[in-house]
């Protein structure tokens, strides 16, 4: 059974507190947009698709449980202000801004309808937010299917048999509404009997790989090994052939129009390693992560976080034998007074990316080495979902 990081029913929302993983599974109630803003900012919930869903549903819960004005315009203004506020919780993630924009347009349309009142505007918003939750899971399953098929058909390792894959950060059920993007590809390979082994990097400094991805892999009984970020090159060189490593698959927080991809810090390094060692480097993300208005990675704003995330580590006490969940300790691991630079993301140039896996297929570069990401939006509503979209 796949992990459930978001529990929702109309008027109620709970999120799995990811700061307490992998040692404790505790859910936090989210009652309002303010609760969601803090949960996103504090990274109790994280992952570009997940934070968009949590933000949308939090406002739906708030609207469902409050006494609203009867005037449609007043409710529209309230929703717009809350959406603008929620977007400030994680500016790098385009999914959040994209979801907010779609919900705002739906709200404006509902408010402008003949006979509209506060209740009808609320219903339009809540129904749209709930649909986003359902659609995200379906899209992730499609991403997994397309990615797995592409890897088996387009890699030397895939032609030999079950493949091994490396991944970075957390892109599974904990980062989405369910199933996952990059980790969803690994799940799909495993379900098809095509996965030999998964390797996940710890993802310093927030350790999403060791805390979250490793947790999901163990939970789903997928054969996997955890490595530190600095071991990736050695893994590809020393065990790439014996493990039949086909490539590295990662998620994305924002994909620019030219294919430049902002993702968790350390992604760029892995792309360089993949190129050097001749394995595929793939980005898995829903179309909502693709931002055609952002021309290149140079236009992406990179969030910088507190240096304490680098110099301090936090977790339950362990005496070398047993784990004491009742005692949470913070440990200093760096010289006192040292300066710290802590960008949360980096940008991987499109030239290092072999394919971008979406819910409608895998986008490849044309003969000139150029991604045409507008093609994935032309596939909107198409009954055919190709495994490859390329050379267009």
Swiss-Prot record:
Name of this protein: Methylthioribose-1-phosphate isomerase
HAMAP family: Salvage_MtnA
Keyword Isomerase in record: yes
Chain's role: Catalyzes the interconversion of methylthioribose-1-phosphate (MTR-1-P) into methylthioribulose-1-phosphate (MTRu-1-P).
Pfam families documented for this protein: IF-2B
GO molecular function (one): S-methyl-5-thioribose-1-phosphate isomerase activity
Site (Transition state stabilizer): 169
Gene Ontology process terms (BP): L-methionine salvage from methylthioadenosine
Sequence similarity: Belongs to the eIF-2B alpha/beta/delta subunits family. MtnA subfamily.
Annotated keywords: Amino-acid biosynthesis, Cytoplasm, Isomerase, Methionine biosynthesis, Nucleus
Gene: mri1
Residue ranges crossing the lipid bilayer per the database entry: none
Record: active site: 253 (proton donor)
Cellular compartments annotated: Cytoplasm; Nucleus
Family annotation (NCBIfam families): eIF-2B_rel (TIGR00524), PRK05720.1 (NF004326), salvage_mtnA (TIGR00512)
Gene3D superfamilies the UniProt entry points to: translation initiation factor eif-2b, domain 1 (1.20.120.420), Translation initiation factor eif-2b, domain 2 (3.40.50.10470)
């Amino acid at each position: 059974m796949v992990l459930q990081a978001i529990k929702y029913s109309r008027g109620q929302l709970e999120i799995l507190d990811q700061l307490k993983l992998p040692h404790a599974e505790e859910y936090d109630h989210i009652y309002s947009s303010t609760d969601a803003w803090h949960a996103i900012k504090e990274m109790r919930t994280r992952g570009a698709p997940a934070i968009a869903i949590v933000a949308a549903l939090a406002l739906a819960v708030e609207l469902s449980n409050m006494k609203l004005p009867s005037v449609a315009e007043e409710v529209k203004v309230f929703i717009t202000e809350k959406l603008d506020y929620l977007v400030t919780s994680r500016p790098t993630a385009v999914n959040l801004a994209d979801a907010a924009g779609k919900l705002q347009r739906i709200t404006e349309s509902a408010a402008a309808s003949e006979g509209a009142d506060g209740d009808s505007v609320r219903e339009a918003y809540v129904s749209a937010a709930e649909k986003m939750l359902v659609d995200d899971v379906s899209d992730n399953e499609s991403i997994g299917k397309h990615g797995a098929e592409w890897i088996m058909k387009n890699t030397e390792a895939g032609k030999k048999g079950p493949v091994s894959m490396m991944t970075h950060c957390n892109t599974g059920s904990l980062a989405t509404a369910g199933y996952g993007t990059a980790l969803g590809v690994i799940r799909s390979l495993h379900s098809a009997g095509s996965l030999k082994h998964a390797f996940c990097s710890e993802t310093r400094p927030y350790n999403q790989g060791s805390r979250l991805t490793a947790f999901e892999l163990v939970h789903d009984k997928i054969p996997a090994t955890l490595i530190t970020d600095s071991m990736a090159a050695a893994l590809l060189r020393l065990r790439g052939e014996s493990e039949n490593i086909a490539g590295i698959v990662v998620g994305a927080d924002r994909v620019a129009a030219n294919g430049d991809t902002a993702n968790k810090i350390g992604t760029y390094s892995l792309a360089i390693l993949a190129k050097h060692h001749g394995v595929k480097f793939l980005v898995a993300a829903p179309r909502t992560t693709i931002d055609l208005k952002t021309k290149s990675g140079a236009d992406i704003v990179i969030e910088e976080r507190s240096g304490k995330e680098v110099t301090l580590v936090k977790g339950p006490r362990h005496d070398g034998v047993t784990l004491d969940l009742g005692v949470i300790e913070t440990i200093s691991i760096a010289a006192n007074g040292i300066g710290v630079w802590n960008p949360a993301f980096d940008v991987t140039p499109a030239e290092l990316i072999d394919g971008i896996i979406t819910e409608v297929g895998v986008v490849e570069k044309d003969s000139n080495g150029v991604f045409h990401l507008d093609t994935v939006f032309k596939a909107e509503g198409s009954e055919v979902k190709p495994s490859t979209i390329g050379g267009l």
